[in-house]
Amino acid sequence: MYSASDLRKNLRIKLEGDPYIITEFNFVKPGKGQALYRCKLKNMITGNQFERTFRSVDNFEAADLQEKKMQFLYTEEDRYCFMDNTSYEQIFLTADQVGDAAHFLIDNLEVEILLFEDKPLGISLPNFVDLVVTKADPWAKGDTVSGNTKPVTLQTGYQIMVPPFIEEGEKIRVDTRTGEYLTRVKG
């Protein structure tokens, strides 16, 4: 159980039976009266956002969310299949639930599936993923002098900007939080 003074950004609470995450948080102390907490909340099931003001005497239940390690198996139309490595149970998530994480999903990648009352809500990727460059324009020596970048296509179909010396067939490390190139991966 949380009190209003426990509220902070990224806290997950249960409100009216649904899980919410606090995306913005402001403490307001008026000249007279009790303190107020102005929050922007995002429904973790529907994705809807709204603002709400809470009084300092309000209490909240913690959202009963579990994270489960699972392995990405395959894509079937607009559904993504994941498997629990211990029970071999398979679950499907929609393209909306996976979101932008789809750009970095490769076979057998271990991810965290966020569950609310045993229903999947979304996924958390590892911070870094190694992906193969499937399409890259050739480069000429001297192109690196100006510090330019060039677009490449990765094995998932995602396009990112990389240094000009990256070639087709090479494996690179990508930051899944920003979608940016980090380094070349040897071997």
UniProtKB/Swiss-Prot annotation:
Annotated keywords: Cytoplasm, Elongation factor, Protein biosynthesis
Which domain of life does the UniProt lineage start with?
Bacteria
Q: GO biological process: what's one of them? A: peptide biosynthetic process
Subcellular location(s) of the protein? Cytoplasm
Q: Does the keyword Oxidoreductase apply?
A: no
SMART domains recorded for this chain? EFP, Elong-fact-P_C
Listed GO cellular component terms?
Answer: cytoplasm
Coiled coil regions, renumbered to chain: none
Q: Name its pathway.
A: Protein biosynthesis; polypeptide chain elongation
- Main localisation: cytoplasm
Q: GO molecular function: any one?
A: translation elongation factor activity
Family as reported in the entry's similarity comment = Belongs to the elongation factor P family.
What's its job? Involved in peptide bond synthesis. Stimulates efficient translation and peptide-bond synthesis on native or reconstituted 70S ribosomes in vitro. Probably functions indirectly by altering the affinity of the ribosome for aminoacyl-tRNA, thus increasing their reactivity as acceptors for peptidyl transferase.
What is this protein's name?
A: Elongation factor P
Species of provenance: Syntrophus aciditrophicus (strain SB)
Cite the source lineage: Bacteria, Pseudomonadati, Thermodesulfobacteriota, Syntrophia, Syntrophales
Q: Which gene encodes it?
A: efp
